[in-house]
Amino acid sequence: MTLKGKKVTVHDMTLRDGMHPKRHLMTLDQMTAIATGLDAAGVPLIEVTHGDGLGGSSVNYGFPAHTDEEYLGAVIPKMKNAKVSALLLPGIGTVDHLKMARDLGVHTIRVATHCTEADVSEQHITMARKLEMDTVGFLMMAHMNSAEGLVKQAKLMESYGANCIYVTDSAGHLLPEGVKERLSAVRAALKPETELGFHGHHNLAMGVANSIAAIEVGANRIDAAAAGLGAGAGNTPMEVLIAVCSLMGIETGVDVAKITDVAEDLVVPMMDFPIRIDRDALTLGYAGVYGSFLLFAKRASAKYGVPARDILVELGRRGMVGGQEDMIEDTAITMARERGV
């Protein structure tokens, strides 16, 4: 199957998912420098919020260096061509957060739920459509639901008014075959005018391969991050994805050299540690654990003397999902007690 001439919208995650490894402490200068670089490189859509979305500032998820309003207010006025998006998780973000984002100039809102809980998104998706925003339903941890199950959840979000549905590999656990199975089923079930997106993580080094697999079965929005900056081993590395798309004739509108420069000159120097597939990030992908659990598990490991890898495997065995960050320490305490540490 040739993908030459296929047009894809690349959606940058550096300034939202990338907040996880930065412990949500990016400065306004870092945000604006990277955002303007992405804009100049031709990236059409850039996500800006706390790593856990609008309203994420909390004891549970971490306190950011600045408020969502401050980050959005700094970035949006500097954009020449790119539009800015925001993530919202019902139960963390509220309708008031949604209205605030719209008033600041946010173009796209992505309403995210666990892949079996789309029904909690109705209020937020409905309001976003009333506000005439580009409205995305974002189904997280997609490996934990079957293709048939994802179809039901996607159709719920579509019925609430979402004009794009994302299948999200939050754990970086899926392989290309699993991506194709899920996205092809969702694509066939949605209205032709409803867009389809894919969000990948690189914990098994499958980010680019899975993104191409998604494009093959009809996805036209693809998430990626410069230098892969994101939870776990990072998101699909954008500069690599753009280069591969260029070689395949997939049209992204993003300049290969410019996005590579953003990654190398702006993002890599900002990293607090290398974003790579270490033993713990690999365990996230292998065990199917939510990507942002990584730093929480490492902190619990240092505190209780249980290897982070063992904590992550146990979290996977228990089926923990995004939003249960408080259970990581509880799990580590239980394991330490059982081991007599």
From Swiss-Prot:
Its ancestry begins with: Bacteria, Pseudomonadati, Pseudomonadota, Betaproteobacteria, Rhodocyclales
Q: Which family does it belong to?
A: Belongs to the 4-hydroxy-2-oxovalerate aldolase family.
Alphabetical GO biological process terms = catabolic process; L-leucine biosynthetic process
Kindly provide the name given to this protein in its UniProt entry: 4-hydroxy-2-oxovalerate aldolase 2
Instruction: Tell whether Chaperone is among the UniProt keywords.
Output: no
Q: What class of enzyme is it?
A: lyase
Marked site, Transition state stabilizer, at R16
Alphabetized CDD domains for the sequence:
DRE_TIM_HOA
A GO molecular function annotation here is:
manganese ion binding
**Coiled-coil intervals:** none
Ligand binding (Mn(2+)): D17, H199, H201
Q: Where is the active site?
A: H20
Q: Which annotated residues bind substrate?
A: R16, D17, S170, H199, Y290
InterPro entries xrefs: 2-IPM_HCS-like, 4OH_2_O-val_aldolase, Aldolase_TIM, DmpG_comm, DRE_TIM_HOA, PYR_CT
EC number from the UniProt entry: 4.1.3.39
Stretches assigned to the Pyruvate carboxyltransferase domain:
8-260
* Catalysed transformations (reactions): (S)-4-hydroxy-2-oxopentanoate = acetaldehyde + pyruvate
Stored NCBIfam families: 4OH_2_O_val_ald, PRK08195.1
Instruction: Give UniProt keywords alphabetically.
Output: Aromatic hydrocarbons catabolism, Lyase, Manganese, Metal-binding
Keyword Metal-binding in the entry? The reply is yes
